[in-house]
Amino acid sequence: MAENGAAVQENQNVIRHQEVGHKSLLQSDALYQYILETSVYPREPESMKELRELTAKHPWNLMTTSADEGQFLNMLLKLINAKNTMEIGVYTGYSLLATALAIPHDGKILAMDINRENYEIGLPVIEKAGVAHKIDFREGPALPVLDQLVEDKNNHGTYDFIFVDADKDNYINYHKRIIDLVKVGGLIGYDNTLWNGSLVAPADTPMRKYVRYYRDFILELNKALAADPRIEICMLPVGDGITLGRRIS
């Protein structure tokens, strides 16, 4: 029986890797579930649990930040004592809520997304959690807003943390702007930088269309971040991969 069980698990892993596009990067789904059930879910704030379960019912739920990454962001923001933050790409607001719960009562989040309707799915939960006053939500493309911010020198170096989880084909365009807005010693977080594990997959690997389409943009971003002398970087296999860039100049 043990051999049969091992064969089933091996077959499941093969099936998973035949189509790149799985949210967790861990090879074992059971191990990922262990992390969630042992470390994440027992300590997840009730409001984040409510929003996670609400988002799971939405047809585009794959866009949400994973629960383990939400926990990571929440702790990271506390460690760096972040107060003035920015989020590019909001969806229903799970990572936004993780940020809002981590920063102080007078902290601020400039949040941008092209779809307010998705944001309003999570807004009642955010309001009930008592942190909606920290959020300045802007509907529409982020680049025009960033251009306005960069134009005013008073905004340079004023952000403690900036999280980017939006259109992957604009990640480099975002980086060109937000590098001036984050303070020296501040952090930028780029989500999905391991892109469903597709970055090292053979060219003939079956992939979902969106995974294949954005793959080259993520590869280009990762090379650009590694070559940027203005930041120190650390790529972490949390969620779908997150790269942290600490501005040093």
UniProtKB/Swiss-Prot annotation:
> In which pathway does this enzyme or protein participate?
Aromatic compound metabolism; phenylpropanoid biosynthesis
Tissue note: Mostly expressed in petal limbs and tubes, and, at low levels, in flower buds, stamens, pistils, stems, roots and leaves.
Keyword Nuclease recorded: no
Please tell me where substrate binds in this chain: K23, D165, N196
Chain residues that bind S-adenosyl-L-methionine: T65, E87, G89, V90, S95, D113, A142, D167
Q: Which reaction does it catalyse?
A: (E)-caffeoyl-CoA + S-adenosyl-L-methionine = (E)-feruloyl-CoA + S-adenosyl-L-homocysteine + H(+); (E)-5-hydroxyferuloyl-CoA + S-adenosyl-L-methionine = (E)-sinapoyl-CoA + S-adenosyl-L-homocysteine + H(+)
What's any one GO cellular component for it?
Answer: cytosol
- UniProt cofactor note: Binds 1 divalent metal cation per subunit.
Output the PROSITE patterns linked to this UniProt entry. SAM_OMT_I (PS51682)
One GO MF term on file is:
caffeoyl-CoA O-methyltransferase activity
Give the knockout phenotype.
Reduction of eugenol production but not of isoeugenol associated with abnormally purple-colored leaves and stems (e.g. especially in vascular bundles), and pink flowers due to the accumulation of anthocyanins (e.g. petunidin, delphinidin, malvidin and peonidin); purple floral buds and pink blush upon petals opening that fade in older flowers. Disturbed CoA esters homeostasis and reduced lignin levels, but accumulation of anthocyanins associated with perturbated biosynthetic gene expression.
EC number(s): the record gives 2.1.1.104, 2.1.1.-
User: What are the BP-aspect GO terms?
Assistant: circadian rhythm; green leaf volatile biosynthetic process; lignin biosynthetic process; methylation; phenylpropanoid metabolic process
Name its co-factor(s): a divalent metal cation
InterPro entries, per the entry: Cation-dep_OMT, SAM-dependent_MTases_sf, SAM_O-MeTrfase
Organism domain of life = Eukaryota
Which residues does a divalent metal cation bind? D165, D191, N192
Quote the PANTHER family the UniProt record gives. Answer: CAFFEOYL-COA O-METHYLTRANSFERASE 5, O-METHYLTRANSFERASE-RELATED
**Protein name in UniProt:** Caffeoyl-CoA O-methyltransferase 1
This protein's species is Petunia hybrida (Petunia)
